[in-house]
A protein has these predicted regions:
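The −1 position to Zn-ligating cysteines in a subset of zinc-ribbon hairpins
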Residues: 2-4, 116
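Extended alpha-helical scaffolding segments
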Residues: 15-405
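Short Cys/His-rich metal-coordination motifs, predominantly Zn2+-binding knuckles/fingers
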Residues: 5-8, 120
Length: 405
């Protein structure tokens, strides 16, 4: 490829300012930070540290409106210095001083220049680019300004600065689906006592919840929060992984005291608890077969398969919830689905064990007690564990007849 169109170059320019990896860059003429023709790392692009969340509507217009949030009490009379970069005096190669850099509001934040970029070419073709270091952006306590990120308290900074709370953006956990961390996405009731919350949901979510409570948005409205973040590799100089996931849900789930919200968060926890029981079954079967390596990977594989099979079920169940739903009945139905899935996977694990596991062997459990590990004993523990993890999925005689032998 020798060139790209100006339109495509503009898209890559936005991407570069947002997610460019750290590392050594070309030194820009006139930048006092340059040494030996090189600009040394100042961190990733402006959005690289965020656990980004935006709301997807049915149309582009709806999506734009859902994500335009009045982020401060005095938003009607914003700071006069809050301007997009193209309405300010042209920047030089040097980093702006702390006193004038900002950001002063959403306009300057959304057009933050993490890099100094020069495109080469003409009106019809872009043939090259030079990327140099730009302005650092300290995200500490920007949760009242940046509306599209998950935030969490920073223990190390609170200890260093001897004050609380201090919030930093929290990238998403790329190792698990968004629904498994649903409680971090949805606004939560204030914690008991005077302690500030450990996590803050994105302001776009809080704002839509407020519009729902005040009746601006109807209780039958459905929205699709999409989470996006980037994982960087060695010294943040390379992109390791890009995460993107979305969930369709009714707006009542965004309201902090909503019974539907509680049911959804508890349902995600139900799945986690059931999979923990399945993991223990896999570990106990390994012990029964004579394995002394409790980290053999059997438990991880069993958990991975369980989450894969529960994934579509939870997404469909969540999207089904609405103002006419009975939270208790819906959660009961979910627990029964989880029970059926984990029971089947558990029986498959038991059936796959050989004669050595049927006979079993003596061992010591997690509490230091001597026990006899066998496939039959592991299955009994498994069924008992599921009964405790999923108490609403009560076992009936009909269910027992339908379960695999």
């Amino acid at each position: 490829m020798k060139s790209i169109s100006p339109a495509e170059a503009a898209r890559w320019l936005v991407h570069c300012q947002a997610y460019d990896p750290s590392g050594i860059k070309t030194g820009a003429v006139g930048d006092p930070r340059v040494k030996g023709g090189r600009g040394y790392p100042i961190g990733v692009g402006s959005l690289g540290a965020l656990g980004g969340v935006h709301l997807e509507g049915a149309t582009l217009r709806e999506t734009l409106l859902l994500n335009l949030v009045p982020v401060a009490p005095g938003w009607q009379n914003g700071d006069d210095r809050d301007l997009p970069v193209w309405e300010r005096e042209p920047q030089t190669a040097s980093e702006e001083s702390d006193g004038t850099r900002g950001p002063y509001g959403l306009l300057s934040l959304y057009t933050w220049q993490s890099r100094r970029v020069r495109l080469f070419g003409n009106a019809g073709d872009i043939t090259g680019a030079m990327i140099a270091i730009g302005d650092r952006l300290d995200w500490q306590d920007r949760h009242l300004l940046e509306p599209m990120s998950v935030w969490g308290r920073s223990g190390p900074r609170e200890r260093d600065q001897k004050r609380t709370p201090i919030y930093l953006p929290r990238p998403h956990d790329h190792s698990r689906a968004l629904w498994r961390g649903l409680q971090t996405l949805l606004p939560a009731p204030p914690p008991p006592g005077a302690d500030p919350p450990q996590r803050l949901s994105p302001m776009v979510v809080q704002w839509l919840a407020r519009l729902t409570v005040t009746g601006v948005v109807g209780s039958d409205f459905r929205v699709r929060p999409r989470a996006t973040s980037v994982t960087y590799g060695t010294q943040q100089a390379v992109v390791d992984e890009v995460f993107s996931d979305a969930l369709t849900m009714n707006v009542l789930l965004l309201v902090e005291h909503s019974a539907l919200r509680t049911a959804a968060v508890d349902a995600a926890a139900d799945a986690e608890n059931a999979v923990k029981v399945l993991r223990r079954l896999a570990d106990n079967l390994s012990r029964a077969a004579g394995s002394r390596d409790i980290d053999s990977g059997d438990a991880d594989r069993a958990a991975e398969q369980a989450y894969a099979e529960l994934d579509r079920g939870f997404r469909d169940w969540l999207a089904h919830l609405g103002p006419g739903s009975d939270p208790v009945a819906e959660r009961t139905a979910w627990q029964r689905l989880v029970r059926r899935t984990t029971l089947r996977l558990g029986y498959e694990l038991v059936s796959a064990t050989g004669p050595a596991a049927w006979i079993g062997r003596a061992g010591v459990d997690r509490n230091g007690r001597e026990v006899h590990y066998s496939s039959s004993q592991a299955e009994a523990w498994f069924r008992n564990g599921l009964a405790k993890a999923l108490p609403m999925a009560s076992e009936t005689s009909q269910q027992r007849q339908e379960e695999p032998a």
